[in-house]
UniProtKB/Swiss-Prot annotation:
Subunit organization: Interacts with the regulatory subunit KefG.
Membrane topology field: Multi-pass membrane protein
Listed GO MF terms: glutathione-regulated potassium exporter activity
One cellular component (GO) term of this entry: plasma membrane
RCK N-terminal domain boundaries: 400-519
Protein's UniProt name: Glutathione-regulated potassium-efflux system protein KefB
Subcellular location(s) of the protein: Cell inner membrane
Gene Ontology terms: biological process: proton transmembrane transport
Function, in words: Pore-forming subunit of a potassium efflux system that confers protection against electrophiles. Catalyzes K(+)/H(+) antiport.
Recorded family membership: Belongs to the monovalent cation:proton antiporter 2 (CPA2) transporter (TC 2.A.37) family. KefB subfamily.
HAMAP family on file: K_H_efflux_KefB
PROSITE patterns, per database record: RCK_N
TM annotation in the entry: 4-24, 29-49, 55-75, 87-107, 111-131, 152-172, 177-197, 207-227, 230-250, 262-282, 284-304, 324-344, 356-376
Length: 601
């Protein structure tokens, strides 16, 4: 693709995203489906603005690559080891069972047995990009079903390697003398990457961070991700797997959050490009000529994968209310099918329109998932939020609440219990199905739903409520909800949970002054007790705690413009020295005053 054509394609992609995604959100069908429809519109079978789909699709895989790097940052090696049973147990069972059933059906549809095996394996895979995106949107990533879903996706990425190696063997074109030397060199190169990354990455990023230039840090992060992807691609392995490993190696480093912040904007944009490219690849000509075959294939594919996943979730012990979400979010075909089927086609395994039919089936199955998840959400909302079957009076009246509490994790539970103990009328919203079921057993009136949806807030009583307390786990959800309330319910008094200083800065910039850093108050209290244990009078320790809180908050406000810049490091050091000096002067003055308390703890 020439430079001018590339620029034109970029403009078209951005225009399609800007036009389609807000429209999709307004229609309530989700951003992912909006991207897919935008791709169909501008692709060769739509308006025909872009015709070179294969090249763009390969480039757009970088969105999946960046996503897997961020996921790797969220998992340390010990956590990955804890997931080994679900990865190699449930993940392997899903791929093998689904592939076997689908391959059998393809043989009944006049596919050669070799082509049926490849087709079954390809269709058994799910879309990593779509599933992870939907799991984040639905709040599944921290639930048991979300963890199991991630394990299945990770095994599927690992299965890419043997699946690609199987194609030439099935085609009968494999060398009689297998080149073990090449295999050994690939294994050696992979080992070098692991060992080198384990011992070199942190010193390298420490050196780069010392420069204090954020742009260089961002460039180094991009270099790491793209190099890992290129290296794995050269070895014939999954690019996404390479960047995932790089993320895991840096998961325990002090630069984890900075790395995530540097990558996040690129990840979102490239993921959108990936979904648009998938939509562009939909061959409407094949769809028109084989409409019944394709429609039946999509339904059969989704149903078989859902049944398999539901059965495995039940055997694994997932709660019944979470099984449908787990089965639905992984029910589509995936991006790996494009690679596997292209490889099989080059080996002449497919006949006639067989490859085109399979690719159309995969693409359409991806379009069904957002709609399926939306339908299941409505069903779960009706099931969980409907009238109680028993006559027990709920703790919380849901009509005209004074306060809406968003999130009912450990943080939100403390707040809700305090409010209920003081006879406040509250409505609690939670999107973790397991938490909703568990808390309802204890008598709490908790409602299932995504609070970032305006209609849900309105039905929860936001127009009549006085305050909203936001205790979301994800900072992105918190900021989205803040903006939503400020736009649609400006009368609400917003109180929010901040996980750390960065989130506190973002809340202050958004105009939210009432927030609590989740570990700050408890850390201060433990610090006060430590001072008392070292011999300080409780009165002085209490005053020291109050001084520290006030001065730290002042410095927090002063650093607002610099919270996203590496300059904050040097300013924070200066602020710490200033804090110590002011604190020392005030405490010296305090010691000259009479003690207010006489009793020690």
């Amino acid at each position: 693709m020439e430079g001018a054509d590339l620029l034109t394609a970029g403009v078209l992609f951005l225009f399609a995203a800007v036009a389609a995604v807000p429209l999709a959100a307004r229609l309530g069908i989700g951003a992912v489906l909006g991207y897919l429809l935008a791709g169909i519109a501008i692709g060769p079978w739509g308006l025909g603005f872009i015709s070179d789909v294969d090249e763009i699709l390969h480039f757009s895989e970088l969105g999946v690559v960046f996503l897997m790097f961020i996921i790797g940052l969220e998992l340390n090696p010990s956590r990955l080891w804890q997931l080994r049973r679900s990865i190699f147990g449930v993940g392997a069972a899903q791929v093998l069972l689904s592939a076997a059933v689908l391959a059998g059906l393809l043989m009944l549809a006049d596919f050669l047995w070799q082509a049926a095996v490849v087709g079954g394996i390809g269709l058994a895979m799910s879309s990593t990009a779509m599933a992870l995106q939907l799991m984040r949107e639905k709040g599944m990533n921290r639930s048991e079903s979300g963890q199991l879903g991630f394990s299945v996706l990770l095994f599927q990425d690992l299965a890419v390697i043997p699946a690609l190696a199987l194609v030439p063997l099935l085609a009968g074109s494999a060398d009689e003398h297998f080149d073990w030397f090449k295999v050994a060199m690939k294994v050696l190169a992979f080992a070098v990457m692991l060992i080198g990354g384990r011992y070199l990455l942190r010193p390298v990023f420490r050196f780069i961070a010392a420069s204090g230039v954020r742009e260089v840090f961002t460039a180094a992060t991009l270099l790491l991700v793209l190099s890992a992807a290129l290296f794995m691609d050269a070895l014939g392995l999954s690019m996404a797997l390479g960047t995932f490993i790089a993320g895991v190696l840096l998961a325990e480093s002090e630069y984890r959050h900075e790395l995530e912040n540097a990558i996040d904007p690129f990840k979102g944009l490239l993921l959108g490009l990936f979904f648009i490219s998938v939509g562009m690849s939909l061959n409407l000509g094949v769809l028109y000529t084989h409409l019944l075959w394709v429609a039946a294939s999509v339904v059969i594919l989704v149903v078989i994968k859902m049944l398999t996943l539901y059965l495995l979730a039940r055997l694994y012990g997932i709660r019944s209310s979470e099984r449908m979400q787990f089965a639905s979010v992984l029910s589509q075909g995936g991006e790996f099918a494009f690679v596997l089927f292209s490889t099989a086609s080059s080996q002449r395994l497919f006949q006639g329109d067989q490859m085109a039919l399979l690719l159309v089936t995969v693409t359409l199955s991806m379009m069904t998932t957002p709609l399926l998840m939306k339908g299941i959400d409505k069903w779960l909302s009706h099931r969980l939020n409907g009238p109680e079957e028993n006559d027990e009076k709920p703790w919380v009246e849901d009509d005209k609440p004074q306060v809406i509490v968003v999130g009912f994790g450990r943080f939100g539970q403390v707040i809700a219990r305090l409010l209920m103990a003081n006879k406040m009328r509250i409505t609690v919203l939670e999107r973790d199905i397991g938490a909703v079921n568990l808390m309802r057993k204890y008598g709490y009136k908790v409602y299932y739903g995504d609070a970032t949806q305006v209609e849900l807030l309105r039905s929860a009583g936001a127009e009549a409520a006085e305050s909203i307390v936001i205790t979301c786990n994800e900072p992105e959800d918190t900021m989205k909800l803040v903006a939503l309330c400020q736009q649609h319910f400006p009368h609400l008094h917003i109180l929010a949970r901040a996980r750390g200083r960065v989130e506190a800065h973002e809340l202050l910039q958004a105009g939210v002054t009432q927030f609590s850093r989740e570990t700050f108050s408890s850390a201060l209290e433990l610090g006060r007790k430590t001072l008392v244990s070292l011999g300080m009078h409780p009165h002085q320790a209490q005053r020291a705690q109050l001084h520290f809180r006030r001065l730290d908050m002042r410095i927090l406000r002063e650093l607002i413009p610099e919270h996203s810049d590496m300059v904050q490091i040097s300013r924070a050091r200066e602020a710490r020295r200033e804090l110590e000096e002011i604190f020392q002067r005030e405490m010296q003055q305090e010691r000259r005053q009479l003690d207010g308390w006489d009793e020690f703890e």
